[in-house]
Amino acid sequence: MRRKRYERFRRAVIGVTLSALASGGLLAATTTPSTAATTPPSAPATSHPSASAWTVSDPARSALTARLALDAAGELRLAVARGGEPVLSPGRLGIRTDQHDLTTGLRLIGRKDRTVHDTYRMTTGKELRRSATMRETTFTFRGADGARLGVVVRVSDDGVAYRYVLDERGPVTVTGEASTFEVPADAKAWVQPYATSYESERTETTAGAANAAEPRTCADDTCSFGYPTLFEVDGSYVLLTEADVDGRYSGSHLDHKDGATAYSVALADDEPVTSPGPLSTPWRTAIVGSLDTLVGSTLVDDLAPPSRVRDTSWIRPGTDDWSWLSDTNSPGDFDRQRDFVDYAAAHGLEYTLVDAGWKASWVPELVRYARARGVDVILWFDWADLKTQAQRDAWFSKIKAWGVVGVKVDYMYSDAQSTFQWYDAILRDTAEQHLMIDFHGATIPRGLQRTWPQVMSVEGVRGKENGQNPTRDVFLAFTRNIVGSMDYTPTWFSRPNRQNSLAHELALPVVYESGWTSLGDNPEGFAAQPVAERYLEQLPAAWDETRFVSGGPGQQSTGERQAVLARRSGDRWFVGGILAGTGGTMKAPLGFLGKGTWLVETVADQDGQLRRTVRTVTAKDTLAVPAAANGGFAALACPAAKGRTDCDQPVTTAPATTLATDPSTVTAEAGKKASFGATFTLPEGAALRDVRMTVDRGRLPAGWSAAGADVRARSLPAGKELKGRWTVTVAGDQPGGTVEVPVVVTYAHPAGGSTPPVHVEEVVRVSTPLHGTVYASDQPFLGESNGFGPVERDQSNGEAGGQDGKPLTIGGTVYAKGLGMNAPGQVRIDLQGRCTRFEAHVGVDDETDGKGSVTFTVLGDDDRQLAATDVLHGGDPAQPLTADVTGVHTLTLTAGDGGDGKNYDHADWGLARLTCAD
């Protein structure tokens, strides 16, 4: 079969070549130029008028070759062979713009060869230190109308890629590509019906019959499939994807006609893309080789532009606990989020991720609580709240002031050029603000983690939130996770009706790579699995080396599917094995371990529980682990030493400390001074190192200043107090209200190394007397709740995030100041007992188009009602609402839902203001 396929491949290439030669009267030319000869990068382009087929080989000339051929019609085709055997048959190349058709009528006018050698370092991924060598040939063609087309072909030991170069100086509009990959119809295929979420289920089929996988995604006889798409051709694996996509282009996918061998590149939404010229398109990429080659491939990153972030010291991969998966309502519960912070602190996790539902009113307090315990906070955002530059500027500066270190951004669901332009913008902004980022509801990674190393992970996968499927788990190890970090959210041990075993679940964060690994269970679920807890405490988030061990996406001879991968961090190897099927013995040859004797801890299923065993092995041994149905195992190997009984490294956590301010609240008029002190203590434990206490002057409002020296201690033993004192000067034009002045203590984390210092913070609330006219939207909230998203200041209620509303509008009147709620909503404001009157124009915002019903209530101290409206409906004119607030300290403004639920209940408090003492 293989020999027949090779003959078909050879005849196809020769046929294209001879046709072109005959048309040019050049049949006597028998030598095919090869890029194997070294040509300096600076060598001028040379014309090869006699050539119509050219070979580019991998630098070692050992396995892969790409063969580019030009036929009699001037059409280009590219074929790929491995070890002389065909892998991809000749597939069309070419590109169309609104000015030129560069898919036919082409002739070669130049060629340039070079070897690309690149070394770089990643912050995440399967291998931190990278080295890539690729053979590159740039072919220059001229079209029938005189336009020039560059085709750049690169071949490495793990794949082949090509891109188009258009050297036009003005804007270039690409209307489509002729690019196709030709795969034998009977080749095994693992495909994913295309969806912009990349959350479709993968299916095993054949290349020709792939359209039967999910006919609902098809139009007529053509179906679309998302990257990466995997094929097996006579023992060689081919993973098709793309690399180096940014806002100059759109993402693409593969279109396939039923029964055909061609998989054609289609631009997102079948829309043209326009870019400033000259234009280099994304790389059309095929990772080619054995499963070992695929698992270890870094080709997608190798093809991406170098890092645009010079200083990466602030970027830290790690593990986070995450409450949303096990309880979707929990991110809105401050106390529950503290539980997750406590768990992270106790088990050495770097982060807590707070998902959809968090409240701006309590996030700063949660961040202070977490940082004092050595845990950093990641916040979820709906991308609708970060779409514009103004939104990003406002939110990023705010959360940086809170102490948030990263964001998880959700719901992009698009491969359009405009979306990639948004990716460019938010990546630039997060790099400038030193915010790490995880893209959820996103496209797949196409090398962006090399260019933007603050990208910790990307979803682009049907993950845990979409149910369980052990077969899917195996497929993903050989498809999606090959091309970049994958936010799969593993380890939900307590999941009801779990379909895989405990050991399968534990193995997933080793089988899958992610710069941020979001653990899916809750503290109680983890506590019920102490063996798993111990293993997860040791788990790194970035790797020095990754190896394929055994298994594959296809069924084994015994009927099950397996994936076993090994990843190294320092001198320790972590091994994860997962199985889809009835169970059996999983085998892991240990040749990757190297010389000497090794200690191996193995965690596997036994009688429905996790059991840990320890043994000594060498690289000649094979680990054999009995596996349950849909089971697996997790192992940890380290060099054996006398007296060593495990591979654990210490889990070092931040100690409990106290930071108290005295007083915690002070009053100062505009332009006046206020003084306060602070005391920091370590009650017990080993002495702290490099301790510093200061006022964070960078977070003071404009016009404020702070006097007083920082207080430092090289060593602070338990029981000894560190004291400081400062005086702040209030800005002369400071309006009434309360400003939080942060007092910060930092000290070296006991773990040492590159672990960031522990940050302990308390705030002194400096209260400036309210005077004159005071707008409610300018005051800090003592508390806040809302029916949907946050309460908005000076705009109507928007989406799930903040600052995404529209101008407050009731009955056609626009109000520049006020509050926007979605009933039921409420805010509490400190009046200091200095105000006498509250007034506002209230009603349902016009954006509801006549829908919605709301009540408005004003409450004083002890929730005493001061004023209220009847039920107001959408389309009603604004109603004046006034209340006597003389002597009131806490004012509460409440919007009720009118008794019929909260839909469309956008409650506006137009020009909500107070009259206070002068």
Stretches found by the model and what they are:
Residues R2-T39:
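Secretory targeting and sorting signals
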Residues P49-V300:
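N-terminal accessory beta-strand-rich subdomains and adjacent acidic, glycine-rich linkers
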Residues P276-Y351:
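An acidic-aromatic substrate-binding cleft motif
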Residues A356-S501:
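Aromatic- and carboxylate-enriched substrate-binding clefts and catalytic-loop regions
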Residues S557-K595, F633-L636:
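Carbohydrate-binding surface patches
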Residues R615-V651:
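C-terminal beta-strand-rich structural cap/linker in extracellular carbohydrate-active enzymes
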Residues V651-T768:
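Long beta-sheet-rich domains in secretory-pathway and surface-associated proteins
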Residues V760-D918:
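Gly-Asp-aromatic-enriched flexible segments
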